[in-house]
Amino acid sequence: MGSKSFGNLLDLASGDLLDIPQTPRYLPRVMTVPGIISDVDGYGISDGDSDVISLPCRERKIIVANFLPLNGKKDSETGKWKFSLDNDSPLLHLKDGFSPETEVIYVGSLKTHVDVSEQDEVSHNLFEEFNCVATFLPQDVHKKFYLGFCKQQLWPLFHYMLPMCPDHGERFDRGLWQAYVSANKIFADKVMGVINLEEDYIWIHDYHLMVLPTFLRRRFHRVKLGFFLHSPFPSSEIYRTLPVREELLRGLLNCDLIGFHTFDYARHFLSCCCRMLGLEYESKRGHIALDYLGRTVFLKILPIGIHMGRLESVLNLPATAEKLKEIQEKYRGKKIILGVDDMDIFKGLSLKILAFEHLLQQYPSMLGKIVLIQIVNPARGSGKDVQEARKETYDTVKRINERYGSHDYEPVVLIDRPVPRFEKSAYYALAECCIVNAVRDGMNLVPYKYTVCRQGTPSMNKSLGVSDDLPRTSTLVLSEFIGCSPSLSGAIRVNPWDVDAVADSLYSAITMSDFEKQLRHKKHFHYISTHDVGYWARSFSQDLERASRDHYSKRCWGVGWGLGFRLVALSPNFRRLSIEQTVSAYRRSSKRAIFLDYDGTLVPETSIVKDPSAEVISALKALCSDPNNTIFIVSGRGKVSLSEWLAPCENLGIAAEHGYFTRWNKSSDWETSGLSDDLEWKKVVEPIMRLYTETTDGSNIEAKESALVWHHQDADPDFGSCQAKELLDHLETVLVNEPVIVNRGHQIVEVKPQGVSKGLVTGKILSRMLEDGIAPDFVVCIGDDRSDEEMFENISTTLSAQSSSMSTEIFACTVGRKPSKAKYFLDEVSDVVKLLQGLANTSSPKPRYPSHLRVSFESVV
């Protein structure tokens, strides 16, 4: 039995969404039933519908995340739910970066289960009181979605952990993947229920919702959509092991802006797009941009910040002052090294504690003078790996304390319980050094919080009995593998796996001079205070507005099924070439010129066999037999190959090697471009290209009579691209005084004589026709790559300049839906062949058949 396909899960989850009309300007009553989109697009709406709430024309931000920034509990006496804002959630403080007039709506799940019978009431109250739209997932879906696919598959993979065997991680499970898609669909339904397309900007957060953009983009082509990934993004070698890798990549690419904490994470994402989807990227005015089917997808690299005011208000609490005095008295005479981490296999807890043990071994003078206080936050997931990490941590702490401790000295203090925010802040404020030793982490804001607490407040200083003018100090020891490390340049960076080096770094941090500690602290505090969560939200929001600015200037349509859906966006004047209309124009005309590229136009680019098909030869022969037609193949291929492949077409013109050689028909001689025949430069270029070929596996040299081309389509994409840039620079330097042009095309670097291009040769052919009194009133030009763009541009320029009084119908057409100077497109080579057959049938005399046997194929075409 064939395997079941899961590529169309979007359709299964969503039903038919494409036929629903555009969202009107009103906000429907909050929905509570997953999968039902009521009153979003005019269904069941009558005049005076009481359920419809008018919306003012006001900018809104819809923040979508797995969890709402709320805390909730059910009152045991009244049975009523009580909710409050979670001030520890960064999402709650995003509004600090928006203008005061901006309305913020949150969409997400609650952190606690609400019975189905209570969901209607809870939904209504949350929206009315907090502007929150609750997403209720069925319990089985939530378990498979969050604890299953997110925590057992995506989370480990994004942190470079592969399930090499059953004992180390969960293998890919299609059932969990289906739950992930279903959960994302439920989130999409909620967003669709409140979206106001023209005013709203949607900002999606983290790996839990990576296919949500596909649902939204499929439903609303011009939705303004941003995504920020709060976890690492793995290298392509790790990511490519994921069976649903393309679905997730295309999901993110359906956004207008994708955010990452560091360039490393963005670089890995770009590498995946390049290697798996064949996309190219460039830097545009300081912004990294991917060209994706006519849309420009921008990347944003900016680490998140913290809410300074929130943390400072905690430092001013009376409870904090009391805890400060308590800790200060308890550890008087000792320097505190502080760690605050989740109980997680990626946080490097055991490595950190081992490094502290090495510190005590290597520097026995520190015994009794330093203490490592490790606060352990509750684990976010559950499983054998968490239990193993906890056991290893406890065993290591016990061994160290038994060996180095005494009745009044405990070297390692492990606090494994929920620690109130005020207590953590007190430990931050009194710690001489803070160490974050994670082996892999997305951002980690512990160093930020530590630095702000070390800066203190007047109230805290009063509690400690220190002057406000006293210079502040702080020291950070940070793993190289966490997102905040690049931002805090004054930190001591370490490889967490090198336990000895970490121990030495801790010793350096403790014994560092106060002046150096002050300088490092000042540098960090300035960065943290100027890059808070408000700055982060404002910067991302501004870039999202910029990225979605031209949505209404292009024509958009969706292609692909299921989670392979993507949006094509092109110029409003760019449309599919109608074979019927082209044939009609051909029939009306008296003199015609047709210019055709070869590779990618008459023969598929990916085809190993480069000979033209029998259908192509038959159509070309029929077109060439018409004395009113001038047909040319304009190609970068050599004249020998083209002559051999197109030999059956006696009257076919050929412009080989981009027009360096031209032949009007098979019986005529080859003409050169009239340029100098001095090709001595090839003796310089060929050895250089050979050197790059030897050092770039998968590359090769194509030697033409007039040009040399270095191909790297079979090389590693990143390395081949890098080598091509280097080769381009090398050749441009060497050939600066030679009459040649060095071009970089799609996976090639080409050196050819100046004054040779497809645009110039088509212009010369048309000029010759005009000089001979053959003024074409019908011109077709078809190509598929960059070199053909010059043809499209030159044809209209030549005809308008030399025959302004003549009315000529010009059909410039590119193969494939992509940005082009042509006005028309055909999807693939087979469409080009159908067009040529349609034109050929018009030129050729029709055989006489009985009327009842005549069949028209135009409707099929």
Curated annotation (Swiss-Prot):
Query: Which molecular function terms from Gene Ontology are attached?
Result: glycosyltransferase activity
Q: What is this protein called?
A: Probable alpha,alpha-trehalose-phosphate synthase [UDP-forming] 10
Q: Does the keyword Heme apply?
A: no
As recorded in UniProt, its EC number(s) are 2.4.1.15
Q: Which domain of life is it from?
A: Eukaryota
| Region annotation (Glycosyltransferase) ranges | 59-546
Write down the PANTHER family for this protein, in alphabetical order: ALPHA,ALPHA-TREHALOSE-PHOSPHATE SYNTHASE [UDP-FORMING] 10-RELATED, TREHALOSE-6-PHOSPHATE SYNTHASE
UniProt keyword Cytoplasm present: no
Q: Which GO terms describe its biological process?
A: trehalose biosynthetic process
Q: InterPro entries this protein is in?
A: Glyco_trans_20, HAD-like_sf, HAD-SF_hydro_IIB, HAD_sf, Trehalose_PPase
Phosphothreonine PTM positions read 32
Which residues are annotated as modified residue Phosphoserine in the UniProt record?
5
Query: What high-level taxonomic lineage is stated for the organism?
Result: Eukaryota, Viridiplantae, Streptophyta, Embryophyta, Tracheophyta
Q: Which family does it belong to?
A: In the N-terminal section; belongs to the glycosyltransferase 20 family.
Alphabetically sorted, this entry's keywords are: Glycosyltransferase, Phosphoprotein, Transferase
Species this protein is from: Arabidopsis thaliana (Mouse-ear cress)
Which reactions fall under this protein's catalytic activity?
Answer: D-glucose 6-phosphate + UDP-alpha-D-glucose = alpha,alpha-trehalose 6-phosphate + UDP + H(+)
